[in-house]
């Protein structure tokens, strides 16, 4: 079986290239120094020297708490919040005589809130502990002292142990691969748990350790880097039989990755437990807090200030009243209080001290102004909101079986306030599914038909004729029959016709480069014989497929060769040719090119290279520039058609030159220093010169479904969209037109360094002069752009004002991001309707995002799909990852994940708007209900000469926030909708309510606070004045303290819950149950609590059953007070809807009118003034925000 497998998998010797073979000529200067001090004794963990090193064991714990520290550590986490600290202090003081109520009544709500959070933390930690136990107790085979493999638990592994891992098992630690079931020591690894990628990685063992028979007797020593978090790097040396062998990431198998398609592997443990790279990466992502949450903290501080002010005011009046209780001649004013025989708390002779102690009492008494359950309620609401986002079927992508995912619940409401979206292009706006559509060879363009971008652009400009539509449709039918990745048609070269072309030899060389210059893996289906390719990028896959379809089939590769089925251009027959693979000069974002060095069957050394035009044309030899002008013209046309282009070149290398270069290159590869990569790039740079131009490729990356409509809708919502792409300027501009980012009639402001003066300075090689001239050029262009937009900005409120689109390339962006120019660049950018940054590096993407976020102070959202977008996602206020073809790094670094860009429309305009509105209304209501309750205590205190006696029973106050008013507000935060999802999408301008923070402005917050204070005044004074002098009992007695307290408290509970009912726009049965159920729970509590013995129920004893409930006055006063307390809000809302309606009010009124009248626009006849005022106000604000200072 193993032999058959080896035979069938010969092709998989991919990474056993000669360039990866170990060499003993290594500089070990850094081994043993700081950062490179780890020593591993292979297969000898009991070595005395190994024992002295005392490395960590393989036991892993990801829990936050232990049984010993759970209570203190969890309590510490809870009391980091200022409000909780306040309530804790109050709880302690409640045991003193200063307390206006009993200690248990204070402790109960605090314990409930803290306890609920601690239970949540404990449950989550128990889940983590369960996962840890499962992982630590997994079994793995380890080589024992007897020379046989025995099973042991993961947690018992030690550094230096030799282990055997079987197919589909996870690696228990970071291992050095010694051998595998394959002859050449390779294995396939799935790294889903590390980076989210599902495609298999290929690893290979050093040739010296790949012999399975001698593996049990293997002894060696590894000196390598210390534990670190870098998943894709490893520096070390293996000392074996007197020789030194450099180690690379290709030999390292990381913990929690899985062995696939390989029967077994042998490995030696290098890093264990928390030293493994996966555990080194187990850190929390950057903490992000929404602007609403930050503002909420400010409101809490305001409430604390109000608390201190009213407590101080009460203590001053109390001190004055206490001082007056005894006049200078010793006469007592309030003799019935016996001020001559009292404690310091009421002693007229020590009035200042009495006032101070009263101040402390008042701080506790009015503490209900601070909402103790606010934070917990918001956490619950946000989690439930996240569940709704995750379950939204409209954001589920059936083709990939990927739903939307809220990876954090902290930023739900922030989704409703996004001002600027910064988007990657490839894989985000486009499908990242490359198709070979055109090419230029020897100055001749090949490939028929129009691209998707060309069609969209011509349709937008109204230039598309019926004949062109028919031609393109016929080509589309051919494309549907083509294989994936190849939508090319040109009768001159398909089906082997290229051999009849006058430049057939150059065509042969062109496609030969495409078939050889790559790192793809051929996979042959044993049943059908069909070959598929595993490539590092969709571009590479498209090139290999294109070369195969045009007669150059890549079918096998080993560590030293690449084999092709080729069409011979002389005979037209297929022949097999084997090319010896010597070195691969890998692609990187800085190099922007890739090359391979091969020896062809004629024994000639060839360098085959492909790369970006910005770097390749500079490397052409003088005699290799034939057809350069034509090729550049074709590249420009391809870019205008939205295609991605690469330049294809080659050169023949002299044998002597190669020998000298190879020695330098190999020396660079075997270095163990920080500048190793730079030295490798420098060596590669020396051979990649004097190239001969063959032509260029053009691949199409089609737009994702629904992207233009999504961008159009977001633009209507007033959201600005920036595209940050690595593409050429022409490509980016035309993609911008195709996806509606740029529109016909929009004036483009192009900022670039393509000027003859700067090019002349570059040729002279004067870098300082180039930098200075470039800086001045960008400064001038930015100021010219500012002058163009100035007139429009001054008249921004006018309809149909001119629109601008800013396009800036990567070189220009480098200078625009300079601290001296960034302010001008940003001000110009935010005056434009669309911004495209071309040729952007990953670092520039992150810097632009930071500039927009910090410079505007508004909410930014970054969206991308690749590892190069991670910095941008983490820098933005909100990071959205696209789960696309470039792995899952972006998703794992994001706050929200969606499968397609078009789902961003619903995520923002629907869920963002709802969450923003729910959270803001929820917070405002929280402060309203606490002020309405807390100020009734203050008014009663003032009425009772600030005696320090609360108006209510202790347990009434304790249960207010926890039981009688908490559930309705949670229901509000989860279920309320001002308008339906359909209307959110139909009227995108509604989204501006969140962007402009209309619903959480200081005006609105203070308005709700004022509403609470007014309600408290009405409740208190109306209750006092209607009940204090009236006969309440049948025997003529007036109300006492306990009845008055129950009546006021009932009025508060009814008022705040009815206020909730009239504030809600979208009722569900859950909200009905919670609102009216909370009122019912209050009466149920009153009956049960009042039936307890008087020693416990105190003033509540039978007060409702025997006194309040039987009295008609109680119910009459309750109705009158509640109605009167709600009347100011009713009045305000009626005025607002009539004269200053909010945009959602207009929509709701319009929909209501449409349902009751046949005329669909009847509301516009009834509310013209309101509509025009509101729309004008929104547009004015929308334009005004574009002027940044």
UniProtKB/Swiss-Prot annotation:
> Per its UniProt entry, which superkingdom is the organism in?
Eukaryota
Record's GO cellular component terms: membrane
Q: State whether keyword Nucleotide-binding applies.
A: yes
Q: Which InterPro entries match?
A: ATPase_P-typ_cyto_dom_N, ATPase_P-typ_P_site, ATPase_P-typ_TM_dom_sf, ATPase_P-typ_transduc_dom_A_sf, HAD-like_sf, HAD_sf, P-type_ATPase_IV, P-type_ATPase_N
Question: Which EC number applies?
Answer: 7.6.2.1
Record topology, Cytoplasmic segments: 1-71, 121-299, 377-920, 975-1004, 1064-1069, 1133-1189
Catalytic center residues: 424 (4-aspartylphosphate intermediate)
**Which Pfam families is this protein grouped with?**
Cation_ATPase (PF13246), E1-E2_ATPase (PF00122), PhoLip_ATPase_C (PF16212), PhoLip_ATPase_N (PF16209)
User: Which topology term describes how it sits in the membrane?
Assistant: Multi-pass membrane protein
Regarding protein family, the annotation reads: Belongs to the cation transport ATPase (P-type) (TC 3.A.3) family. Type IV subfamily.
UniProt-listed NCBIfam families: ATPase-Plipid, ATPase_P-type
The record ties this protein, via PANTHER family, to: PHOSPHOLIPID-TRANSPORTING ATPASE 8-RELATED (PTHR24092:SF165), PROBABLE PHOSPHOLIPID-TRANSPORTING ATPASE (PTHR24092)
* Function field: Involved in transport of phospholipids.
Name listed for the protein in its UniProt record: Probable phospholipid-transporting ATPase 8
Mind giving the lineage of the organism this protein is from? Eukaryota, Viridiplantae, Streptophyta, Embryophyta, Tracheophyta
Q: Which gene encodes it?
A: ALA8
